[in-house]
C-alpha cells in the first residue's frame, strides 16, 4: 500500500512539473488537458501530430467565437 501511495505521489509531482513547464512555455493547457495529452502520448500518439490538432482546434474555436460576436 505504501508503494502505491509513493507511486501516486511521484505521478502527481511529475504532472506538477509538466504543468509548470507548460505554463512557462505559455501553452494555455490546464492540468486536465495536459493530463489527457500525456496519456495520449503514452499510448503512442505522435506528439507533433497532437500539437497540430490542438493548434487547429484553437484556431477553429477562435474563428467560431469571432463569428458569434459579429453576429450578435
UniProtKB/Swiss-Prot annotation:
Pfam families the UniProt entry points to: MOZART1
UniProt keyword annotations, A-Z: Cytoplasm, Cytoskeleton
Q: Could you state one GO biological process linked to this protein? A: mitotic spindle assembly
Q: What is its main location?
A: cytoplasm
One GO cellular-component annotation of the UniProt record comes to: centrosome
Q: Which InterPro entries match?
A: MZT1 (IPR022214)
User: Which subcellular locations apply to this protein?
Assistant: Cytoplasm, Cytoskeleton, Microtubule organizing center, Centrosome; Cytoplasm, Cytoskeleton, Spindle
Tell me which family the UniProt entry assigns to this protein: Belongs to the MOZART1 family.
**What is this protein for, i.e. what is its function?**
Required for gamma-tubulin complex recruitment to the centrosome.
Q: How does it assemble?
A: Part of the gamma-tubulin complex.
Q: What is this protein called?
A: Mitotic-spindle organizing protein 1
From what organism does this protein derive? Xenopus laevis
Amino acid at each position: 500500500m505504501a508503494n502505491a501511495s509513493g507511486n501516486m505521489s511521484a505521478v502527481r509531482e511529475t504532472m506538477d512539473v509538466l504543468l509548470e513547464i507548460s505554463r512557462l512555455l505559455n501553452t494555455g493547457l490546464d492540468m486536465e488537458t495536459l493530463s489527457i495529452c500525456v496519456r495520449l502520448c503514452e499510448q503512442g500518439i505522435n506528439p507533433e501530430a497532437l500539437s497540430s490538432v490542438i493548434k487547429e482546434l484553437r484556431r477553429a474555436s477562435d474563428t467560431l467565437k469571432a463569428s458569434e460576436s459579429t453576429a450578435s
